[in-house]
Amino acid sequence: MKRIILLTLLCTTTILMAQRINHIQEAIADYDYETALILIAKEKTTIPLLLQKGKAQRGLGLNAEALSTYQEIIANDTANTRAYIEAAECCRSLAKNQQALKYYEQALDLNPENKYVRIQYIGLLLSLQKFQEALGESSLMTEKDSSAIALHLQAQSFEGMEEFLPATGCYYNIQEKYPDDYLAAAKLGALNIAGSYFDEAIEATEKYRRIDTTNVAVNRQNALAYCLNKDYPTAIQRYEYLVSQGDSSFHTCYYLGISYYAEEKYYEAHDFLEAARKYDPEN
């Protein structure tokens, strides 16, 4: 009889605990992080609950508190990859970038094949202008991974080192593999324009425009290439489209004004150059 009572109590306790855990998970799923933290505080500390606690704290913008939570997990479970990743994310939000790098490195030591961590790690190296290290990491990545993001990271590393020729090569590679990648097209436009290769800039941006004629970033480079290549009628068409889509930026107004002026449409030129002058009254 005592055994039956004991088993009944154990089953009841287990069921109640499972229900409480479910309530925590439901609160987090509903983004009700305050309720989740209140419920977690009533439970015995476990690694899974600490992970939930950290997520709730981050959801409420309590990044310093969340970092402490993930550090507690790491202290008790040094092989918990997720805790290192989350700690790194917290450090980034707190501008503790060197500490974030270390956490990413520890996560990669535990799981070298984790693509998300490697992308974040290289991205952080780039933001810290550690371009040589970023190039090394991204080049290793592209040996096994030819995804657009891997190639972009390598290209950005070359750009940061002012190695524009190999950077351009990377972007051409991306455009060849992923023709719908607008950023590669825009970058090719910008890099070729910077080198005064206007025909190449036009070719790269027009290649993308055969897929999508609406992308603002690509259209800006395309229009500028036509303008600098002195094909003013086409430049005017491209810039007029940008204006019709609400683009009133300095460069759009300025180069549209220049294009109108070159075509001797002085009234239109005046209007757009005047609009551009508002951004730079001393010019």
Regions of interest found by a model, annotated:
Residues 29, 59, 93-94, 127-128, ...:
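Register position in tetratricopeptide repeats
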Residues 52, 59, 86, 120-123, ...:
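Canonical tetratricopeptide repeat
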Residues 48, 82, 116, 149-150, ...:
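Start-of-helix register in tetratricopeptide repeats
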Residues 42-43, 76, 110, 143-145, ...:
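Structural marker of alpha-solenoid helical repeat scaffolds
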